[in-house]
Amino acid sequence: MTKFTPLAMTKRLVAFDTTSRGSNLDLIEFATSYLQDLGIDATLIHNAEKTKANLFATIGPTDVPGVVLSGHTDVVPVDGQDWTTAPFDPVRSGSRLFGRGTSDMKSFIATALALAPDMIAADLKMPIHFAFSYDEEVGCLGVHGIISHLSKISPLPRAVIVGEPTDMKVVNAHKGVFAYRTSVLGFEAHSSATHVGVNAVMYAAQLVSYLSELAADQRDYHGKHHRFEPPYTTVHVGTIQGGTALNIIPKECSFVWEYRLIPGENEDAILKKFSNYAEDVVLPKMKEVSEQTAIITERLGRVAPLVPEPDSPAETLAMMLAGTNRAEAVSYGTEGGIFQEAGVPTVVCGPGNILQAHRPNEYIEIAQINACEQFLRRLIEVAATQSV
């Protein structure tokens, strides 16, 4: 079989277009075949439509707690972005490798896969697990199947390392992400008859304005979490759609919004304030004109915050492997908080820089791939000599 370097494996994985709206099965089937050629059985956990799959595999003994190397296989779209190279035809230029997913986050998965032969040869006393998910970029949907699979493993892993891009710094805390869609249902009429219509767009604007007030409250009141940038919970409206024509009072308007929560804060507080304002202030004005009006808010996704666990097995191990005694905090979300909620100590540490994620001409410094390789080689040394 072909032996891959971490760089070569990264190029191979980036060549798969695994944009979240499509399938990741070509990549998963490649990884499964690669592992099978090494004598490693992989468990695939499919979505309901069988169009996507998670991969879970174990190298080493199955009767002692191990370390999970976790990564997502999907990437964000390239539509409308001005790329100077083909996004799924990775190109090396100087010290950088360009392509969608190079930083976020196929390099980590690739390095783990490339080192699988070395893990086998090391005769591990502590297992190393691969957990590669789908649909992280659209709400961490796939990882829940991996969590269900973990619940069947005895004993549970001792630690999870999520390889999102951190410049190989150890991250023990990140914000939670809570996403919603609010739909305002008004009453349609001719634009000259504003007294009989209920303008869904204008009432939606009031709700968006209130979210701006909540965002300002967070910024002004919460400024003590200096590990984060920015050091407070943020509120953001991403998209809004409504109306059909200038001379029609719009019947419908919807907007998608989120808040990114500092770990430890009440995750429902902002939603409750927003819901109370919608029900007690805005909706009564709408119903004065028509009882057919409504305001409906639905949750689109929840990414649990990663809560600091000083001296946890995951933090202790990752710091040793990275050669540091300092842990960082980040404002973006990962699957890490979900693993942590399932009872497994978790940190985030992987190659690449988050500032490159989701951008045109995404790239990773090849030095980062090399640093990840050394990090995982040290993990192999530890796993070959320690069982607890």
PLM regions and their residue ranges:
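Metal-dependent amide/peptide-bond hydrolase catalytic core
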Residues: 1, 48, 181-388
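N-terminal helical capping/dimerization or prosegment-like subdomains
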Residues: 1-79, 95, 252-256, 273, ...
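A structural signal for short hydrophobic beta-strand segments in well-ordered beta-sheet cores
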Residues: 57, 90-92, 237, 339
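Active-site metal-coordination/substrate-binding segment of hydrolases
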Residues: 66-129
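Short beta-strand segments
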Residues: 70-72, 131-133, 160-163, 183-185, ...
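Acidic-glycine-rich active-site phosphate/pyrophosphate-binding loop
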Residues: 78-93, 157, 172-184
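Acidic/histidine-rich catalytic neighborhood of metal-dependent amide-processing enzymes
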Residues: 105-179, 388
